[in-house]
């Protein structure tokens, strides 16, 4: 039972600025998410509120404005840069006569498009099903097809109960399969540990340049694109570090602020590869003005995974986009490198990264 990505092209974006700073979502980042999903942001509607309304999330005045806009220039889908309750989604769809997708659903859809491995597809489906289980009253008559009309009555209680049982059964099946995959990964991990090959995990905010750095270090060709979540399935390669020897380098999925909890849980087994690493390379886009917030978002997820105490080297990437910025290494009071500035694309600063890796990993090599 695969829940397919069904997003179409033209979209209207709704962004609400709240006075409470912890609830503010970055609009530009949301536009990147939308574009990464394959949608075209045809309209962007912004509004400011102290709190969301219980019924529509937005106020009735803004709702009327959107209705009039859609009457003149309709779109295939409405995207809200916030997480909606099932009732809010249902009410917006009924009022606007158009499919409504919130931030969590959009990210899940992007992940559904990106997953390529058996494990990745299972993990995405698991997250989708958990999210869907709270929203069966809208958009689904049963699990084999999605309801075509918008704002129609939901399925009967008997059918809903059947759907819930089917979802619960499928979730159980997926978890069992993921457990088997996790055991195989554990065996591979133990084999690496027996060989005493240092393991380094690349982590970072989505689109920070992890895959470009991965390709530079391993001389491989992992898919790279200027879009969010270009890399979803983890990739590991053996690579040679001068004066150190071979290491195992792991490229992981990029993080984002307010990553859906169900998605974090579904990918926890994959992300736990980072917990077993000897060193984390935290790749940061030095060119991005939001880099400090992004850095904290990544650290929050790493802490949640229980990897907050692992040795970490910060890699400030994309210095080629900053005129006057040069490759450089920063060390702590003990002389240990804590930060390297470089360009994965041009290769400037890569020798400094090699030296830092040699310094930090020399005690892990027999």
Can you say where each PLM-predicted feature lies in the sequence?
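Flexible beta-alpha connector loops of hexameric P-loop NTPases
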Residues: 18-22, 52-56, 114-119, 159, ...
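Conserved C-terminal guanine-recognition region of P-loop GTPase G domains, centered on the G4
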Residues: 27-33, 67-72, 84-98, 244-245, ...
